[in-house]
Every structure is written in C-alpha cells, then in structure tokens.
C-alpha cells in the first residue's frame, strides 16, 4: 500500500513526522507538505505563481503552496506512482464541527477523495505534543484496518483524538459534526507608526456539542470519527425554495 501524507502545519511540524513514523512500518509513505504553516487554508489552490517542490534531507517533499496544492500535485504527476490513499495530519489542534470548513488538514484529505481508499484527517485536540503518541496509535490502528471498511466512494474520515495518554482514552465513537457559536470579533492592533491591523480571533465555543457530536466525544475522552462528504446541498431547504420560486413566476 502506498500512502501520500500531507498536513497544514508545515513540512517541519512535529505532527507530520509523527504520522510518518506511525505509518511507515505498514505502508510505503511519501510526504508532501507546505513549506510553512498553512493552517486555515481550507481547499485553496495557488494560481498566481508556479509551485516548486523541494526534497529535504529526510526525504520529505516541501512545497511553496497550500495543503491542497500538495495533494493535487502528488496525485497529478509529481509522484511516479499514484498513491492508494491520502492521510493528513497529525494536526496540533482540534478540527471539530465548523472547523472543517477552514481546515487545511481536512482539505488535504478531501483532495484525496478520488482514490480507491478512504481519506483520513487526523487531529490531536491540543497545541502541545505531549500526547502525540496517542494520536499515532489511533492513526496506525485506523489506517491499517481500512481495507475492512465498507464506505461509499469519496468518503473522508475526520478523526479527532483527545489530549490524553493512551491508557486514559475510553474508546472510539462514530459522531456527527457539532456546531460552533459565532467567533469572537477580530482583534484590532495599531503598530508604532499608527497603522491599523486586525488579528482573526478565536473560534466560537461549541453551540451544538451534545451527545452524538464530535465535540462531546472528545470531551468525554473518546476518539471521534466523523464521515464527511462533498455534497453540501441543503436538501431540507428545497421545499421552501420551490414554493418561493413558484411565487416569482
């Protein structure tokens, strides 16, 4: 099995090295990742300049682009052999609920949706590395068992691991995405020369975080696994829209 590994924290981030170490004994792994932190890049592609891959001393490939660029190039000519699946992470920080709309970690996995194996996005619910071994364990466990998994084509599995030692993790729960409240207002700053700027503030707290959600699972000490799809059509709105459009003609 051949796996393409990517992330959004950057090619030198500890999480991607940990993911490689977790999977390298079970598969032929190749790493293509951004040359700098691209958190929040979502599924953006770089269209205003050429992309220049550079192989590092450890064999990883660094790219001056986004997480999606990395996977896109990896699946479309940069690699001699097409991977069987894409695995993204390990992100240092949660990708829960609405986070998946902005996450470069999730976006990298989404770009791998056309392959025969399901794509995985792994995130540790912490900015610290203390419990990376826990995330490594579950990444290895889930990816190595993927051949027994029967899911529709183009399924992306978003996995969040609680910030706990392995012996304190209570298990794995299948979850749906929760929802966050509106984010805090951007923080205004003024530099010494009087020029104004803004920092994007923290994401909102869980507004829909009850039982069954990814938020609830990790708070209770479980690994959360949420299947994602690309169809973002809001089917429940069809009735009202159909009636509204009928009244316009």
UniProtKB/Swiss-Prot annotation:
<keyword id="KW-0547">Nucleotide-binding</keyword>
<keyword id="KW-0963">Cytoplasm</keyword>
<keyword id="KW-0479">Metal-binding</keyword>
<feature type="binding site">
    <location>
        <position position="39"/>
    </location>
    <ligand>
        <name>a divalent metal cation</name>
    </ligand>
</feature>
<dbReference type="InterPro" id="IPR002828">
    <property type="entry name" value="SurE-like_Pase/nucleotidase"/>
</dbReference>
<comment type="function">
    <text>Nucleotidase that shows phosphatase activity on nucleoside 5'-monophosphates.</text>
</comment>
<protein>
    <recommendedName>
        <fullName>5'-nucleotidase SurE</fullName>
        <ecNumber>3.1.3.5</ecNumber>
    </recommendedName>
</protein>
<dbReference type="GO" id="GO:0000166">
    <property type="term" value="F:nucleotide binding"/>
</dbReference>
<dbReference type="GO" id="GO:0008254">
    <property type="term" value="F:3'-nucleotidase activity"/>
</dbReference>
<dbReference type="InterPro" id="IPR030048">
    <property type="entry name" value="SurE"/>
</dbReference>
<feature type="binding site">
    <location>
        <position position="8"/>
    </location>
    <ligand>
        <name>a divalent metal cation</name>
    </ligand>
</feature>
<comment type="similarity">
    <text>Belongs to the SurE nucleotidase family.</text>
</comment>
<keyword id="KW-0378">Hydrolase</keyword>
<dbReference type="InterPro" id="IPR036523">
    <property type="entry name" value="SurE-like_sf"/>
</dbReference>
<feature type="binding site">
    <location>
        <position position="91"/>
    </location>
    <ligand>
        <name>a divalent metal cation</name>
    </ligand>
</feature>
<dbReference type="GO" id="GO:0008253">
    <property type="term" value="F:5'-nucleotidase activity"/>
</dbReference>
<dbReference type="GO" id="GO:0046872">
    <property type="term" value="F:metal ion binding"/>
</dbReference>
<feature type="binding site">
    <location>
        <position position="9"/>
    </location>
    <ligand>
        <name>a divalent metal cation</name>
    </ligand>
</feature>
<dbReference type="Pfam" id="PF01975">
    <property type="entry name" value="SurE"/>
</dbReference>
<dbReference type="GO" id="GO:0004309">
    <property type="term" value="F:exopolyphosphatase activity"/>
</dbReference>
<dbReference type="GO" id="GO:0005737">
    <property type="term" value="C:cytoplasm"/>
</dbReference>
């Amino acid at each position: 099995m051949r796996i393409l590994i990517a992330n959004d924290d950057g090619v030198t981030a500890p999480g991607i090295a940990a993911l490689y170490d977790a999977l390298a004994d079970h598969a032929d792994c190749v790493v293509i990742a951004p040359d700098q932190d691209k958190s929040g890049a979502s599924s953006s592609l770089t269209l205003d300049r050429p992309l220049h891959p550079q192989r590092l001393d450890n064999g990883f490939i660094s790219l001056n682009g986004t997480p999606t660029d990395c996977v896109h190039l990896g699946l479309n000519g940069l690699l001699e052999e097409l991977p069987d699946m894409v695995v993204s992470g390990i992100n240092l920080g949660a990708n829960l609920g609405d986070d998946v709309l902005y996450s470069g970690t999730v976006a990298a996995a989404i770009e791998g949706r056309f392959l025969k194996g399901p794509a995985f996005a792994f995130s540790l619910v912490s900015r610290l590395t203390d419990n990376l071994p826990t995330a490594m364990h579950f990444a290895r466990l889930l990816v190595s068992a993927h051949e027994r998994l029967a899911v529709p084509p183009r399924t992306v599995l978003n996995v969040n691991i609680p910030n706990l030692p392995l012996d304190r993790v209570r298990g794995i729960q299948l979850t749906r995405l929760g929802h966050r409240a509106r984010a805090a207002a951007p923080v205004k700053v003024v530099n010494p020369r009087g020029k104004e700027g803004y920092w994007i503030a923290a994401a909102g707290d869980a507004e829909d975080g009850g039982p069954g959600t990814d938020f609830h699972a990790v708070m209770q000490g479980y690994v959360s696994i949420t299947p994602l799809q690309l169809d973002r059509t809001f089917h429940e709105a069809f009735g009202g829209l159909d009636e509204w459009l009928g009244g316009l003609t």
